[in-house]
């Protein structure tokens, strides 16, 4: 979609924004009544979530949604539930329950970092720093990157994925909080490596990239959840958008500003007519493939984050772009009430199997926890000056 065509779409207005916020916190309240201090599964089934243990990579997003609701409403029921979660996250860290992953930022930034920022709770701070230390353990000196998944001595897992750009703020925060540069240095090393190998010449993104475990040399880009190694997985593209924006906030590296614009513009240029992207950009208008609403939610948050640091003309464009994406989500994907779902955002995709990837079909045309969270974050960003959890 050409920029001039995109600019013809309406932006989310103030009235619709505040109506969406009110509805969103009603949804959060309904879900809290259902789940209490329990966690939700990664994605819904027939639009309703089931209970889950705190052993999944997505657990932090539900806690983060509770913190957003508390910030906006002041209702202590949201705070109390979120604080109960921080106790569970401490136990998870101490017992190392499913912590052999780079997703420690997804887990601990919207839960424990948020708790510390909003309440000053020292236990939450200590837990988040413990998670940052565990994330540092995943850094490979030879390759100069944080390994995504699995055992660190498994050569088959010697790779990074684009999602990790959203985990780096945990390290940036840890350096700012402790005064120890080791966290920041490793985050900066990872982002340099990741952007060098993951962003293609046309500014689309690989999902994952392998390195030689003996030498650390880059080997090849492939996909796990995209259509194919050469396609542009929609959610991967938006992890790039938001991840670059966050690293720019912490480093002010001018190269990231330039790269952000190219990566974000690729996303906009490949949007379909209704502005809800297909789960992979290989698909275009007329395809029967499912959309992934969560990709738009994350992209909107990334654009709003970066706009804080751009010259006015560019900032206005990306704020307007985010408002157009959020309006499309409000109009077409937002849950209308508890009878429809206990989530926030319909029409997400977790995994879609193809002959060219190694994931499975699950969470298709369902709510998912990151889609719910980033949709709510996008609304909050548009409604107030907000201090990010990231």
Feature-to-residue mapping (PLM):
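Glycan-recognition and catalytic cores of secretory/periplasmic carbohydrate-active enzymes
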Residues: 1-390
């Amino acid at each position: 979609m050409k920029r001039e065509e995109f600019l013809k779409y309406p932006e989310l207005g103030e009235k619709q924004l505040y109506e969406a916020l009110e509805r969103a916190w009603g949804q959060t309240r309904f879900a809290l009544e259902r789940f209490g201090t329990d966690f939700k599964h990664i994605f819904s089934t027939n639009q309703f979530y089931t209970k889950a243990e705190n052993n999944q990579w997505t657990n932090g997003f539900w806690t983060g949604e509770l913190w957003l609701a508390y910030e906006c409403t002041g209702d202590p029921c949201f705070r109390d539930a979120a604080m109960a979660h921080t106790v569970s996250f401490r136990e998870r860290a101490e017992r190392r329950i499913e912590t052999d992953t780079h997703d420690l930022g997804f887990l601990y930034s919207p839960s424990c970092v948020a708790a510390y920022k909003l309440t000053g709770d020292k236990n939450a701070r200590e837990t988040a720093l413990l998670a940052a230390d565990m994330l540092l353990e995943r850094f490979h000196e030879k390759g100069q990157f944080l390994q995504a998944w699995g055992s660190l001595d498994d050569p088959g897992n010697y790779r990074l994925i684009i999602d990790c750009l959203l985990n780096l703020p945990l390290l940036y925060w840890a350096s700012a909080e402790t005064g120890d540069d080791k966290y920041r240095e490793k985050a900066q090393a990872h982002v340099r490596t990741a952007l060098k190998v993951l962003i293609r010449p046309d500014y689309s993104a690989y999902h994952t990239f392998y390195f030689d475990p003996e030498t650390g040399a880059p080997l090849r880009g492939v996909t796990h959840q995209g259509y194919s190694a050469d396609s542009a997985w929609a959610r991967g593209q938006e992890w790039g958008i938001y991840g670059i924006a966050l690293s720019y906030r912490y480093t002010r590296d001018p190269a990231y500003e330039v790269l952000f614009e190219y990566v974000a513009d690729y996303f906009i240029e490949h949007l379909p007519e209704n502005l809800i992207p297909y789960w992979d950009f290989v698909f275009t208008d007329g395809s029967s493939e499912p959309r992934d609403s969560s990709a738009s939610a994350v992209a909107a948050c990334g654009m709003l984050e970066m706009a804080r640091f751009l010259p006015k003309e560019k900032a206005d464009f990306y704020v307007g772009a985010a408002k157009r994406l959020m309006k499309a989500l409000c109009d077409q994907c937002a849950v209308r009430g508890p009878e429809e779902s206990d989530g926030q955002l319909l029409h997400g995709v977790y995994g879609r199997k193809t002959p060219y990837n190694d994931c499975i079909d699950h969470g298709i045309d369902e709510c998912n926890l990151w889609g719910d969270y980033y949709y709510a974050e996008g609304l909050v960003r548009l409604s107030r000056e907000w201090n990010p959890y990231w």
